[in-house]
Regions:
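Short, charge-rich binding segments
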Residues: 107-109, 118-124, 129-135, 155-157, ...
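Conserved beta-strand and immediately adjacent loop positions that scaffold enzyme active sites
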Residues: 2, 74, 115, 329-331
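Acidic, proline/glycine-enriched N-terminal capping motif
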Residues: 13-116, 124
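Single conserved hydrophobic/aromatic residue that forms the stacking wall/gate
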Residues: 1-14
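Internal amphipathic helical hairpin motif
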Residues: 91-125, 180-208
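Conserved, structured C-terminal
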Residues: 13-54, 58-59, 133-399
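Acidic active-site catalytic centers that drive phospho-/nucleotidyl reactions
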Residues: 79, 128, 224
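N-terminal glycine-rich flavin-associated loop
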Residues: 78-91, 131-140, 260
């Protein structure tokens, strides 16, 4: 679903009506929530919205390619309040978090973040959130697009652990790009530069309560700014845009181009409930030697023992420049046999290539393998290549 602003009207594409922005009843109803930054993003030029975690997310500030250049040359501010938080507290909160994920958290310090997986009893991935440890027994899961709140509450019922699982009033923004550090210094002072990659700290900006982490969904230098009072969303957005004016800051949206360059996953596209961590090469996020009987442990042991039947790979497509990301899964063929699918594809103007993430039969996953992709009624040649496509060691993001 994509909502598009046309002139003074908000149109729901593939639907038969439009609502003006002045209509108080704009939207699909209260089941799809607006973020605290919604009005600000419209003022700053958002022309299209998608739906993610039952919320509107800005997806169109004009040219996606220009958004990409803004990101990698200066900085962009993205409304990612759709990364809804699951808050876990209580005397057994740490034990519960370790039950929920196969990643070893024994060295996770207070003030640290970790990229984790949440899997079901069959080892299928339910979400790939960032975990934030605010205190000894106080955690947030910053979610991808699925209802982990319900899953966590369900697991807690029979866990025998003392935990409280809720959704807090927390709405993140992402400030990403090489100039993001300078903008943050202008807002919070030089001490913000001491914040290390994948760590967090509590801040207050003119009475606005925040948690700031050195994380983001861009593979660029960046920060996530977690607002802890939704009533101050408009004020926060304006303060950041004002501070970034002299640094080339632009309003923007998460860049499909940059995240595919960086090999970053998009849940529902590159991973889902039928995908296991080993197929994605995420063995490091699974600790099968743990004494904890975490959800999915037995299934993951069996998958590891039996071996995977398919694998995620990088692909270069040899065709005309793609006009935008794929909106369907494109079949990958070995002659007449379907052996996989393209999950995310885009043209990279920096690399001057069509690049993609794909899931293929393990027999065809070797680097250099030449295959074909069916794009609508065309057959396109392709080659399996190394991923990520750019900055594979994440030196930019961690700098």
């Amino acid at each position: 679903i994509l909502l598009s602003l046309v002139g003074s009207e908000m149109c729901i594409r593939d639907s038969c009506y439009a609502l003006t922005m002045t209509d108080k009843n704009f939207g699909f109803g209260t089941q799809i929530r607006k973020s605290p930054y919604f009005n600000a993003t419209v003022r700053y030029g958002a022309k299209g919205f998608s739906v993610y975690n039952h919320m509107y997310i800005p997806r169109d500030f004009g040219s996606p390619e220009q958004n990409f250049w803004n990101l990698i040359e200066n900085a962009i501010l993205c409304d990612v309040a759709v990364e809804r938080q699951v808050e876990i507290t209580g005397s057994d909160a740490f034990k519960f978090i370790q039950l929920l994920t196969p990643r070893d958290l024994s060295k996770l310090a207070v003030g640290q973040c970790k990229y984790v997986l949440i899997v079901n009893n069959d080892g299928g991935i339910l979400n790939d959130p960032v975990l934030l440890r605010l205190d000894t027994n106080h955690f947030w899961l910053s979610l991808a697009d699925s209802d982990v709140l319900f899953w966590a509450q369900g697991v807690a019922i029979n866990s025998g652990l003392n935990v409280k699982i809720t959704e807090p009033d927390v709405s993140p923004l992402q400030l990403q790009g090489p100039k993001s550090g300078e903008i943050m210094v202008s807002l919070f002072g030089k001490s913000i530069k001491d914040l290390k990659y994948y760590w967090l700290k509590e801040f207050n900006l003119d009475g606005i309560p925040l948690i700031i982490s050195r994380t983001g969904w861009s593979s660029e230098l960046g920060y996530e700014i977690f607002l802890r009072d939704g009533s101050k969303g408009d004020d926060l957005y304006e303060k950041i845009m004002s501070a970034g004016k002299d640094f080339g800051l632009e309003p923007g949206h998460t860049s499909s181009i940059r995240r595919i360059e960086g090999g970053m996953l998009s849940y529902h596209a590159d991973a889902d409930i039928n995908t296991n961590p080993f197929e994605l090469g995420l063995d490091r996020l699974v600790n099968l030697e743990s004494d904890v009987n975490f959800v999915g442990k037995d299934a993951l042991k069996k998958i590891k023992k039996d071996g995977i039947k398919r694998k995620q790979v990088g692909i270069e497509l040899y065709c005309d420049q793609l006009s935008g990301p794929n909106t369907t899964f494109w079949p990958i063929m070995n002659k007449s046999e379907k052996i996989g699918k393209i999950t995310s594809a885009v043209y990279s103007p920096r690399l001057k290539k069509n690049i993609a993430l794909a899931m293929v039969n393990i027999k065809y996953a070797k680097i250099g393998t030449k295959l074909q992709v069916k794009i609508e009624d065309k057959i396109v040649n392709c080659t399996i290549v190394e991923k990520p496509f750019f900055d594979p060691k994440k030196k930019i993001a961690s700098s």
